Every structure is written in C-alpha cells, then in structure tokens.
Amino acid sequence: NLSVNLQDLESIGWLKLKEIPEGSLYTTFDIVENPKNLQLVEMDMFSRFSAMEGDVDLAMSFFSNTSQEKYNFNLLKLFDENIAYPQVVAVREEDKDAQWVKDFMDAFTSQEQVDRINEKNTPTLSWKILFEVKEDSASLEKSEEKSRKADPNKTTIKLGVTPSFEYYIDYIPEMMGEWGYTVEVVSLDSPVAANTALAEGSIDVNYFQHLPYLLAFNESNGTRLHPCEPYIMSSMDCIASKKYKTLEEVPDGASIAVADDASNLSINLEDLQSIGWLKLKE
C-alpha cells in the first residue's frame, strides 16, 4: 500500500521517483525530489482519514462514499485506472476450484450486485470499470439463478471484510441465500487480521485488498491465499483533506498520511510524482 501511495503522489507531480525494476515496489528511499517539502506520515489504512482531525493536513487512501460521509472530507484528487490495481476476492488455495467459490464469484460479479452498488454510490470511474467487467462476462440467466443449488459440501460461508469494504458486499448474502447458502459476514479490524483469519480457516473468503497486497502478504507470511478471477477494479486511491478543497490550496510543507505497507506506499509515491509533488530516483 505504501508503494501505491507513492505512485499516486508521483502521478500528480508532488514527488519524483527513481526508476526501479518492473514488479518492484517503491519506498521513501526512492524519492529524488520533494519540491513541496511534503511530510510523509506512514499509517495503516484505517487511521489515515481520522488523522485529518488534527495530526495531518491530507490523507491518501481508497475512496468510498461511506468513508467520505463518515469523515466529512474534501476530495482533492481521485486517481485513474492507470495507477490503481485490481481488487481481488481471496480464498485458500485448496478451495479455489470448489463449487461454492464459483457461486460466490457469480454472485459478486452479477448484474444485480453492480446495480445495487451503483444505486447508492456516486458514479465514478471505479464502478464503471466494474460494470464493464460484468458486461464482458457471461451473465447469469434467470432460469439458472432460480434452479441453482448450493454446493452440498459447503452451505455456510464466512465472508471476511474490513470496515470500509462492508459497503460492497451487502447484496451477496441475499442472492446466495436464494441458492441455499448462508453467508455470514465477519468484520475484521485490519488487512492483516483479514488475511490471517483466512489462512487459519476462521473465515472462508475475504474481500478488501488489491492483488499486489495479497501477493506480498503470501510472500511475507508463507501463506497460500488465492486471488479469484475475474479481478474487479472497485476502488481508486484519492487525496483527501478537511483543511483544503483543491490541490492548488495545499501549501509547501504540508503533512500527508500515506500507507505503511510497501505495496500501497509505492503507488502513493508514483501518484505524488504524477502531480509534481515529488521526484523519485531512476
């Protein structure tokens, strides 16, 4: 996530990053220019928006309507799909071919799910991408939906989400319930807790992370969590503030909360460079 934040900052020209090998992640050591003298404060994703109450001037994190309503911030910048990574549903490797996983993904990418989300979400590029993914997928026929039966080997599914992602899955229990499943939503307080719970088996599936974060977690922890396809681009990084309403108002020396993990920090740095606020090493 730290890498994500750095790429975000590069994309708006607030930083310049050095060039690194493809597939590598940016760190703060890769900054070569910091023309706005930004003070980067590394925080977990659940602390960044709340920190704007006093500790920091700006925050970078995933944008959602629920977060904006909860923290009442100004949206200064929403980064486009060239920076964002695909969000993934994750299961344990041994479950990836199970019928219940296929059923879950059909529900998650169904037209009904997309329509429910778009009814209550301000239209953004992120949900247009989700809609396009579904347009290119094989839609569920109504007759198939009604006749579908739950996987006899597993009818109760524990779905783990972090707080900011509960918004995106509230229709799934209803839809899968029509097929004979019981979906229990388990709220977990951090990304690490959500992946640890999945690896240990206290939940069956989770949704909250992008692909680089999942791969980095597997590598660091020796876990075998599997990203299910299709990948869904359901959230975009943003720069938010309670003090300022536009990027132009942000003074030199401002403090900005960025990700405290490598994958998202790298993107944050690149985004800051894209808006001219940093320059990263080659």
Regions found by a protein language model. Give the residues of each.
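A conserved helix-loop-strand patch within extracytoplasmic ligand-binding domains
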Residues: 1-16, 111-114, 228-281
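Short helix-initiation/N-cap motifs at beta->coil->alpha
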Residues: 23-50, 185-196, 282
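Beta->alpha turn/N-cap motifs
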Residues: 44-45, 54-66, 164, 189-191, ...
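Ligand-binding "clamshell"
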Residues: 53-55, 67-79, 216-228, 243-244
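A bilobed periplasmic-binding-protein/Venus flytrap-type ligand-binding module shared by bacterial periplasmic
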Residues: 84-103, 235-248
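Extracellular/periplasmic juxtamembrane helices and adjacent flexible linkers that interface
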Residues: 105-153
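Immediate post-signal peptide segment of exported/extracytoplasmic ligand-binding proteins
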Residues: 135-158, 176-177, 246-254
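Short, polar/charged alpha-helical segment
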Residues: 162-187, 192-193
